[in-house]
């Protein structure tokens, strides 16, 4: 493997074929998880360190379950109580973990680009579990897997992503994956939460930008709502939550305009009653709980790949 190929920092470094191979492996891993004994010895003897510098529920637990299902030794690292609180640098922490025998590090960090720094100083494999606004590749992979398992393919799907586009690491990773696999993507939201269109089209020229959701719904195969980060209200990027919900909130009335085969997704955590309503989040066509379930199989597939 080349230096970057040893790591999964974002999907920009994965070809369409490689992404498809991960999704295919995830299908096999889902079969493992359906058994009475949900474990295979694929990573026996390997040590996976989950190093989370940000709070997480779904991603952290999903990675722990995935690694254990592959029979890996799993170590949960938290910054609280560690030498990081005493001033140890991120690089020194990683070198310590390497000296202790870590084979794979799964890292979440608040600073965009932190995984690139770690990757330069770690001889094993690094999986990015989310860094700042930059990337969340395993969320994108599980989203792709969910779309494919529900709709049969990714190519030519029209995927509408609505919400706080500008500040979302999920969007960026999904754009790499969706465009590589031939989907059509529309980013939708208030202009202040999308930013300049050229910011997106310079990297993904095939992506469309829209500021109204309703006209997109009759032709959408997938609608993915993003969490509205309430702190944006304080910075003046939104006039009022009620106004946002009126124009962009996923209500049962609004989703009645979708084609019968369409699905609704959300990477979580959700602000119910703001970007999505409870009756929508827990009933068809929503597949939000399915996304969470699929995350274990997808992360098993990626860990298996990273272990060589």
Swiss-Prot record:
- Describe, as the record does, how this protein assembles with itself and its partners: Heterododecamer (2C3:3R2) of six catalytic PyrB chains organized as two trimers (C3), and six regulatory PyrI chains organized as three dimers (R2).
Q: Binding residues for L-aspartate, per the UniProt record?
A: 86, 169, 227
List the protein's name.
Answer: Aspartate carbamoyltransferase catalytic subunit
Keyword Chloroplast in annotation: no
GO BP annotations listed: 'de novo' pyrimidine nucleobase biosynthetic process; 'de novo' UMP biosynthetic process; amino acid metabolic process
Identify a single GO molecular function assigned to this protein. Answer: aspartate carbamoyltransferase activity
The record ties this protein, via Pfam families, to: OTCace (PF00185), OTCace_N (PF02729)
Name the residues that bind carbamoyl phosphate: 58-59, 108, 136, 139, 268-269
GO CC, any one term: cytosol
State the family named in the UniProt similarity comment for this chain.
Belongs to the aspartate/ornithine carbamoyltransferase superfamily. ATCase family.
Catalyses which reaction?
Answer: carbamoyl phosphate + L-aspartate = N-carbamoyl-L-aspartate + phosphate + H(+)
Pathway the protein acts in? Pyrimidine metabolism; UMP biosynthesis via de novo pathway; (S)-dihydroorotate from bicarbonate: step 2/3
Chain's role: Catalyzes the condensation of carbamoyl phosphate and aspartate to form carbamoyl aspartate and inorganic phosphate, the committed step in the de novo pyrimidine nucleotide biosynthesis pathway.
- Which keywords belong to this entry? Pyrimidine biosynthesis, Transferase
């Amino acid at each position: 493997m080349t230096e970057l190929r040893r790591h999964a920092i974002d999907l920009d470094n994965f070809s369409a074929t490689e992404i498809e191979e991960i999704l295919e492996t995830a299908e096999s891993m889902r079969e493992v998880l359906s058994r009475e004994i949900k474990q295979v010895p694929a990573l026996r003897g390997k040590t996976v360190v989950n190093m989370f510098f940000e709070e997480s529920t779904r991603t952290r637990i999903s990675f722990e379950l995935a690694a254990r299902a592959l029979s890996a030794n799993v170590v949960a690292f938290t910054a609280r109580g560690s030498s990081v609180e005493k001033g140890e640098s991120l690089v020194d922490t990683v070198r310590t973990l390497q000296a202790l025998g870590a084979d794979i590090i799964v890292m979440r960090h608040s600073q965009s680009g932190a995984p690139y720094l770690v990757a330069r100083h770690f001889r094993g494999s690094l999986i990015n579990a989310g860094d700042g606004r930059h990337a969340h590749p395993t969320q994108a992979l599980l989203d792709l897997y969910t779309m494919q398992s529900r709709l049969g393919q990714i190519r030519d799907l029209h995927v509408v992503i609505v919400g706080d586009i500008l500040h979302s690491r999920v969007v960026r990773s999904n754009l790499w994956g969706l465009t590589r696999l031939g989907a059509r993507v529309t980013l939708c939201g208030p202009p202040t939460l999308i930013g300049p269109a050229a910011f997106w089209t310079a990297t993904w020229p095939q992506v469309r930008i829209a500021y109204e959701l309703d006209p997109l719904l009759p032709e959408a195969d997938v609608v993915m709502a993003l969490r509205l980060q309430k702190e944006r209200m304080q910075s003046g990027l939104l006039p009022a939550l009620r106004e946002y919900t009126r124009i962009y909130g996923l209500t049962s009335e609004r989703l009645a305009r979708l084609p019968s085969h369409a699905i609704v997704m959300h990477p979580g955590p959700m602000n119910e009653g703001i970007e999505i309503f409870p009756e929508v989040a827990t009933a068809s066509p929503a597949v939000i709980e399915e996304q969470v379930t699929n995350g274990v199989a997808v992360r098993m597939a990626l860990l298996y790949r990273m272990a060589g």
